[in-house]
């Protein structure tokens, strides 16, 4: 079916864990006719949760792509995980999407991971609509949730629906644009619904919220503003145009409600995706750079008449077809069996097959065009973040940034004969998951896996066993500590070696400066007048990149500092990139003792929900874990405690929390920042 690009919607479904993302996606697929039955998460039958671990645990672990059609529009959907350990899946999905549906639990409201995924969407300027889900649950409060969206996310929630009833009495919604009630039929699994008059007890509230809707939306369009001043109302088409304009600009976020599990509210959500979220031609042109001149900017027009440009946002291994590279096409067309240029690597690769994916089901296609999200078979070198393009149009698109791991474990095969198989398995999994890192301990030869949390690493080791048939022994989780500097120092270092024949000579003067938390490592060269030839400067950066991973005092990677190469000297015969790499390493070692090295630890933002009677014990326990309580809020006889706690104090916390609350309290946490480790804790670590 040939569909114009203006009728494409590339969207993601994002939320905190258990808000109902996958259930919402399953209903979308059912009502659009993509599948003829509803897959339930709790039965392990959701089509989008296809991994064995997802079915067993009832959670989404990896982002899954699919395509469906609604009223002549093509909707490409990526269902993303809600658990913080898999936030990388959200990051890379949002990088290539034009819009998103943020799903909220109508009882819990805005939760910690809701805030995290919202910030990720802000980073890529992704327009959103909000769907307040679970309107049938006990304790649901639509209006509280709307207020939380405003206060916690700092956006203007534009309410375009009101719930009719709540909890077990939830029947449908009031559509504030048409000023009609929408009621769903239970016996048809929500496939049939009717438009009715608004219930009399909701008329005043509906009119109040419609006036707010008109006041907010009319300002998006001069024609609408004039019409609103004249008649104090707007025709439906003009009002929809205003809501669409404001949503795409980010002036406000349309808010809808429903219960995906009870089959209510999903069709209007589909209408809102079509009506209020952008097509590829509605968003800003993608801007890339020339691989040969990174200062030169190149704009990419979303047209199939332009040269082919795409971004690889995910790589995964399929046991039937091998390596799959998921791409979003930003311009041009691509045919199967053709070749593409990997601009970052300056290498051309051939494509075998091209697939349209529905979770892990594959459909072969011969051609894809601008706006499409497809999977390519046959690429050997492409990794997440690579730009693929026409050979005669080299361009680099902005890569994604991935968070640093916060936890690590030692992994070894149970039998030495499996050592090679383990290496192959982990290499493939690391290639799939940019938030997973692997290294080998130089002292004892142990393989170290680093990830975003205990669950992340648990899933990875489980996949090693299931998918690669390698049984492994796993060490206890360890915190991924870091080091940093606290003082600025200037180091003048000369590397000189003479042992017959050509020697080695390199002199560098480097200014090392501490940076704000989260800045990582930055390198800058201020060499002028040829003090060091251009071709030797990358050797300095490479030397620093390598040596910082080994730490300064405690052996942990060094972060949040800047190294500026300000001067140096070279020898016509004895200088080389290697000599300058060694000089940089020498300067770093000398700097380590002078720059006030400090050890850093990951701090987690923890949300605990507990019945009020256990609050005192839980607060005391948080304090004993070096925690800092940020806020407390009471809702529906439960207390919500928000705290910052070192990750080192959180291992096995769920068992302690259950014991203190007789199994009634729950918690979630996500990475917040790195902070200095108190000296007494450093001493304990050294002693242990």
From Swiss-Prot:
tr-type G domain: residues covered: 6-281
GO biological process: ribosome disassembly
Species: Wolbachia sp. subsp. Brugia malayi (strain TRS)
Protein residues bound to GTP: 15-22, 79-83, 133-136
Highest taxon in the source lineage: Bacteria
GO MF annotation terms: GTP binding; GTPase activity; guanosine tetraphosphate binding; translation elongation factor activity
Protein name listed in UniProt: Elongation factor G
The keyword Nucleotide-binding appears for this protein: yes
Short name of one Pfam family: GTP_EFTU_D2
Protein's cellular compartments: Cytoplasm
Database matches in HAMAP family: EF_G_EF_2_B
């Amino acid at each position: 079916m040939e569909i114009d690009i203006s009728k494409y919607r590339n969207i993601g479904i994002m939320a905190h864990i258990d808000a109902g993302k996958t259930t919402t996606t399953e209903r979308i697929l059912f009502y659009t006719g993509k599948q003829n039955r509803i897959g339930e998460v709790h039965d392990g039958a959701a089509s989008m949760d296809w991994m064995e671990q997802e079915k067993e645990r009832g959670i989404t672990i990896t982002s899954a792509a699919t395509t469906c059609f609604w009223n002549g529009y093509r909707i490409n959907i990526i269902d993303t995980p809600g658990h913080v350990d898999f936030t990388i899946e959200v990051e890379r999905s949002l990088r290539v999407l034009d819009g998103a549906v943020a799903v909220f639990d109508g009882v819990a409201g805005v939760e910690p991971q809701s805030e995290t995924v919202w910030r990720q969407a802000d980073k890529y300027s992704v327009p959103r609509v909000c769907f307040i889900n679970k309107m049938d649950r006990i304790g649901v409060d639509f209006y509280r949730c709307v207020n939380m969206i405003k206060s916690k996310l700092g956006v203007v929630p534009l309410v375009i629906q009101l719930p009719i009833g709540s909890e077990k009495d939830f029947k449908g919604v009031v559509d504030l644009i048409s000023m009609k009630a929408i009621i769903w039929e239970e016996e048809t699994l929500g496939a049939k619904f009717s438009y009715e008059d608004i219930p009399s007890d909701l008329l005043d509230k509906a009119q109040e919220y419609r006036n707010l809707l008109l006041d907010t939306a009319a300002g998006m369009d001069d024609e609408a503003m004039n019409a609103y001043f004249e008649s104090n109302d707007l025709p439906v088409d003009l009002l929809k145009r205003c809501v669409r304009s404001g949503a795409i600009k980010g002036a406000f976020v349309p808010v809808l409600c429903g219960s995906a599990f009870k089959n209510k509210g999903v069709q209007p959500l589909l209408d809102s995706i079509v009506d209020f979220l952008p097509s590829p031609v509605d968003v800003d042109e993608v801007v890339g750079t020339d691989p040969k001149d990174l200062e030169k900017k190149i704009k990419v027009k979303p047209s199939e008449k332009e040269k082919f440009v795409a971004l690889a946002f995910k790589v995964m291994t399929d046991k039937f077809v091998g390596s799959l590279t998921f791409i979003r096409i930003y311009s041009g067309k691509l045919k199967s069996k053709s070749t593409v240029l990997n601009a970052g690597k300056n290498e051309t690769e051939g494509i075998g097959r091209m697939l349209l994916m529905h979770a892990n089901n594959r459909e072969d296609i011969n051609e894809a065009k601008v706006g499409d999200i497809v999977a390519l078979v046959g690429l050997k070198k492409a990794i997440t973040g690579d730009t693929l393009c026409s050979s005669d149009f080299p361009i680099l698109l902005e890569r994604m940034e991935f968070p640093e791991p916060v936890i690590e474990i030692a992994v070894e095969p149970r039998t030495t004969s499996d050592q090679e198989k383990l290496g192959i398995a982990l290499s493939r999994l690391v290639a799939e998951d940019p938030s997973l890192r692997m290294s080998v301990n130089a002292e004892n030869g142990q393989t170290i896996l680093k990830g975003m949390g205990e669950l992340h690493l648990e899933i990875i080791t489980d996949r090693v066993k299931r998918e690669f048939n390698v049984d492994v022994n796993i060490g206890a989780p360890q915190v991924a500590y870091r080091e940093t500097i606290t003082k600025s120092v200037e180091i003048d270092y000369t590397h000189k070696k003479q042992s017959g024949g050509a020697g080695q000579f390199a002199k560098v003067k480097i200014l090392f400066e501490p940076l704000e938390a989260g800045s990582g490592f930055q390198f800058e060269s201020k060499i002028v007048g040829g003090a060091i030839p251009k071709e030797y400067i990358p050797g300095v950066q490479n030397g620093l990149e390598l040596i910082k991973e080994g730490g300064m005092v405690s052996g942990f990677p060094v972060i949040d500092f800047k190294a500026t190469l300000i001067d140096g000297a070279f020898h016509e015969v004895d200088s080389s990139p290697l000599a300058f790499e060694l000089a940089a390493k020498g300067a770093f070692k000398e700097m380590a003792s002078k720059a006030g090295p400090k050890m850093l630890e990951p701090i987690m933002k923890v949300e605990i929900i507990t019945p009020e009677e256990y609050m005192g014990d839980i607060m005391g326990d948080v304090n004993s874990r070096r925690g800092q309580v940020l806020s407390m809020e009471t809702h529906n006889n439960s207390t919500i405690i928000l705290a910052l706690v070192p990750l080192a104090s959180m291992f096995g916390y769920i068992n302690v929390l259950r014991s203190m609350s007789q199994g009634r309290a729950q918690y979630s946490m996500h990475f917040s920042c790195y902070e200095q480790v108190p000296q007494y804790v450093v001493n304990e670590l050294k002693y242990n």
